[in-house]
């Protein structure tokens, strides 16, 4: 997904380890609340592994555009679920 140029990993300056501890940093807390305002989503949310087929990655964000990002985050769904809904 990184090869598309639409995904990136964002870590805290104080914690650059790519693991679940990222979710507790102030930076990630802010990003999780505000990323959709800039067109990004948390790509692999907690408890959605069965849908995304990826483990929870609180550092991995994907650009989808502001409208889609706000819809995805408001509904608490994944990109896969969103795409399935709009294709109906």
Language model regions located:
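Cell-envelope/glycan interface and biosynthesis
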Residues: 1-88
